[in-house]
């Protein structure tokens, strides 16, 4: 009798950025590491995706976006009983210690400075998703 193992599903990352270039970069980095990636262009769209698919293992979001900032998205996720366990990582091209501290205090898992390096994404995913 042979035993077949069911492969583990690929971890699912929701990437949120109003810049198509940054969404593409993050998506390629994650997909090359065997992650399933959904990309959206706003915090509002991210909440719509999360309302339909709760099987998200991590959210990576830009800090500065129109309509709803990444910080606002972080707060909404952490205030939600259904979503609060999803790790949220923020990114920004501005290296502001006050902004970074504020995000971490609000519950962000980490804060990346753009341009994001492949080693940053690999380290982050190994630490956050694989724990």
UniProtKB/Swiss-Prot annotation:
Subcellular location: Cytoplasm, Cytosol; Nucleus
Entry keyword annotation includes Nucleus: yes
Keywords: Cytokinin signaling pathway, Cytoplasm, Nucleus, Phosphoprotein, Transcription, Transcription regulation, Two-component regulatory system
Maturation and modification: Two-component system major event consists of a His-to-Asp phosphorelay between a sensor histidine kinase (HK) and a response regulator (RR). In plants, the His-to-Asp phosphorelay involves an additional intermediate named Histidine-containing phosphotransfer protein (HPt). This multistep phosphorelay consists of a His-Asp-His-Asp sequential transfer of a phosphate group between first a His and an Asp of the HK protein, followed by the transfer to a conserved His of the HPt protein and finally the transfer to an Asp in the receiver domain of the RR protein.
Disruption phenotype: Dwarf, narrow leaf, low tillering, abnormal hull, viviparous and low fertility phenotype.
Single Gene Ontology BP annotation: cytokinin-activated signaling pathway
GO cellular component entries: cytosol; nucleus
Main location: cytoplasm
Xref: InterPro entries: ARR-like, CheY-like_superfamily, Sig_transdc_resp-reg_receiver
Residues of the Response regulatory domain: 12-129
Residues with 4-aspartylphosphate modification: 62
Entry keyword annotation includes Transcription: yes
Pfam families: Response_reg
Tissue distribution: Expressed in roots, leaf blades, leaf sheaths, shoot apex, flowers and panicles.
Induction of its expression: By cytokinin in roots and leaves.
Function of the molecule: Functions as a response regulator involved in His-to-Asp phosphorelay signal transduction system. Phosphorylation of the Asp residue in the receiver domain activates the ability of the protein to promote the transcription of target genes. Type-A response regulators seem to act as negative regulators of the cytokinin signaling.
Family: Belongs to the ARR family. Type-A subfamily.
PANTHER family per UniProt: TWO-COMPONENT RESPONSE REGULATOR, TWO-COMPONENT RESPONSE REGULATOR ORR3
Name of the featured protein: Two-component response regulator ORR3
Protein source organism: Oryza sativa subsp. japonica (Rice)
Upper taxonomic lineage: Eukaryota, Viridiplantae, Streptophyta, Embryophyta, Tracheophyta
Gene symbol of the encoding locus: RR3
């Amino acid at each position: 009798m042979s035993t077949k193992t069911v492969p583990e599903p690929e971890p699912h990352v929701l990437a949120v950025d109003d810049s198509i270039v940054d969404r593409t970069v993050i998506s390629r980095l994650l997909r090359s590491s065997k992650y399933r990636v959904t990309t959206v262009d706003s915090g509002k769209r991210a909440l719509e995706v999360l309302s339909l698919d709760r099987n998200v293992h991590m959210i990576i979001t830009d800090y500065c976006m129109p309509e709803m900032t990444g910080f606002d998205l972080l707060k909404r996720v952490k205030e939600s009983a259904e979503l609060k366990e999803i790790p949220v990582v923020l990114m920004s091209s501005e290296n502001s210690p006050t902004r970074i501290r504020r995000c971490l205090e609000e519950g962000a898992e980490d804060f990346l400075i753009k341009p994001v390096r492949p080693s940053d994404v690999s380290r982050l995913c190994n630490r956050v998703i694989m724990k």
